[in-house]
Regions:
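Conserved, well-ordered alpha-helix/loop/beta-strand core segments that scaffold catalytic motifs
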Residues: 178, 182-212
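Outer-envelope exported proteins of Gram-negative bacteria
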Residues: 45, 202-204, 208, 282, ...
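C-terminal accessory segments of extracellular proteins
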Residues: 474-486
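Active-site-adjacent substrate/metal-binding segments within catalytic domains
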Residues: 7-9, 22, 44
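Catalytic domains of carbohydrate-active enzymes, especially glycoside hydrolases
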Residues: 25-50, 278-280
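Surface-exposed amphipathic alpha-helices with a cationic face
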Residues: 35, 189-199, 322, 346-347
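Alpha-amylase-like alpha-glycosidases and glucanotransferases acting on alpha-linked glucans and related
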Residues: 10, 16, 54-186, 211-434, ...
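N-terminal regions that are enriched for targeting/export leaders
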Residues: 1-12, 28
């Protein structure tokens, strides 16, 4: 793999006149900035409909996009909205998800009404290639009808609507509107992705290994998951207690019925990965270790202290997937305390893994050897870490002195220790270096994007108010890119 570098920035974090980043002009501007400053990759977070706590990792579906990503500015350009529309929190550095949804929905319904009135084309042809969207639209419409409650608590006729015994005529308009939103979102994304390709920028997509229980994935594929007779999960995903959490993490996602997946030649996953392979150039699979061993928590257990590790058919899985999609570019999120078999699985398929400077950097002390290859992606931190500024500031003074001393010994003599750590990242022998935007800008922990194991605000809310500071900092990133041959 050629040495290269890029930036990690959630689409929601882009500047916007309408309260949340989207697929509009700011996304194109960001690609321009990446290309101008010699970057080759843009890593994003999942684009699916955000579920509980506005988390992109608890989506209502693994195929659909969240309608928040639809750009009102592009709808104006398409003359589906008037030239002048109201702005919404354009200079905010946080996304107010509930308010921005209400704000954008009104304009999206107006655009849809005009689309119908003018009898515009394109939707029917798109729908023929994307029949999955009907069940999702039906699911979301019934979810609204049931006050957004989980489908597990819907009336039986709604819970089993896919059996075909329900009169859906009262919901026809809302179903059609929801399908149209997906048509527009995918149209805007595909155009943006082509623009990135034309500028030689690879998009790194992100797929959570698990899906949320309150999702179309579970709703229409109940046989794929470990559920009881009422469709409730019998066991759920998470991780056991460790240094960071005394009771572990109880994520709540339903676990796969791996016997069923094996018997169906992993059809559910083939559909999912094949779909995403058309949207992104690389796919980062979150919690890769679960393809080797996954943690199985009884649903009744209040914490992750009660659970067991169970082996998964990782080799059979990837043999089948790669036979079907031989050119699939997978990045393995292989962080944490792993058994050697996880790394063997990763290396057997030559998947690049991840290295986090905050985890592995130990100043003048010996670094733990997790890799014996350049085939990895190095980050100062990810969306789940403190910002590098916040992390360094929280260290003991002695640790800070050790790191500063060691960076100087290695020849990283820049204006700030954050810039020295960025240089350390770029100088690594890892093939790819990716820097979170918060670290490009040397921001403190007020800009931290997510704290694992916590739910709700301020997670996922940070955004740029504009590109002014970004433009000032990117020349330094370009300098490091050239200096370290990326």
């Amino acid at each position: 793999m050629k040495r290269k570098s890029g930036i990690l920035l959630a689409v929601t974090s882009l500047p916007s006149p309408h309260g949340v980043g989207d697929f509009g002009p700011a996304a194109y501007k960001f690609i321009d900035l990446l290309a101008k400053h010699k970057q080759k990759m843009w890593q994003i977070l999942p684009l699916n409909p955000m579920g509980y706590g506005n988390s992109p990792y608890q989506p209502y579906g693994s195929k659909p996009f969240d309608e928040l990503y639809i750009s009102l500015e592009l709808l104006q350009k398409d003359k589906l909205l008037p030239k002048r529309i109201r702005k919404f929190q354009p200079k905010s550095v946080r996304v107010d998800f509930q308010k921005v949804r209400t704000f954008k929905e009104g304009y999206l319904r107006k655009a849809y009404a005009k689309f119908l009135k003018e009898k515009r084309r394109g939707f029917k042809a798109w729908f023929k290639r994307n029949k999955w969207v009907y069940n999702y639209a039906l699911f979301l419409t019934l979810k609204k009808e049931n006050q957004l409650n989980s489908w597990l608590y819907w009336p039986e006729e709604h819970k089993n609507v896919l059996n075909g015994n329900v009169d859906l005529s009262p919901f026809k308009d809302e179903i059609n509107f929801t399908m149209w939103l997906q048509f527009i979102a995918f149209k805007q994304w595909n155009k943006l992705h082509r623009y990135a390709k034309n500028n030689k920028i690879d998009i790194v997509g992100d797929i959570p290994i698990y899906v949320g229980v309150d999702s179309i994935d579970v709703f229409e594929n109940r046989e794929v998951f470990l559920l009881d007779g009422r469709s409730f999960p019998t066991h759920i995903a998470g991780v056991p207690p460790d240094y960071f959490s005394k009771t572990g993490q109880r994520w709540g996602n339903p676990l796969y019925d791996w016997d069923h997946l094996v018997n169906t030649k992993f059809a559910f996953w083939k559909d999912r990965l094949g779909f995403n392979a058309e949207l992104f150039d690389y796919i980062r699979i979150d919690h890769f270790r679960a393809f080797d061993t996954y943690y199985k928590i009884p649903e009744w257990a209040p914490t992750a202290e009660t659970g067991e590790w169970v082996e998964a058919p990782g080799y059979a899985f990837f043999d089948e997937i790669l036979a079907t999609f031989p050119h699939l570019k997978i990045i393995a999120e292989d962080l944490g305390d792993l058994r050697p078999e996880v790394l063997k699985l990763r290396d057997h398929y030559n998947f690049p893994g991840m290295e986090i400077v905050q985890f592995t950097y130990q100043g003048s002390k010996t670094k733990p050897e997790k890799y014996h290859t350049t085939n990895r992606i190095i980050y100062p931190g990810t969306h789940d870490n403190q910002t590098t500024y916040g992390w360094f500031g929280a260290l003991e003074k002695e640790e800070q002195r050790d790191i500063v001393s060691d960076l100087a010994r290695r020849g990283f003599n820049y204006d700030s220790v954050i810039d020295q750590l960025l240089a350390y990242t770029f100088a690594s022998d890892a093939d790819i270096a990716i820097i979170p935007m918060q670290d490009v800008l040397s921001l403190d922990d007020r800009a931290r994007f997510n704290v694992p194991g916590t739910i709700g605000s301020p997670n996922w809310e940070w955004k740029l108010k504009d590109f002014k500071e970004t433009k000032l900092r990117l020349p330094f990133i370009e300098f490091l890119t050239k200096k370290y041959n990326r």
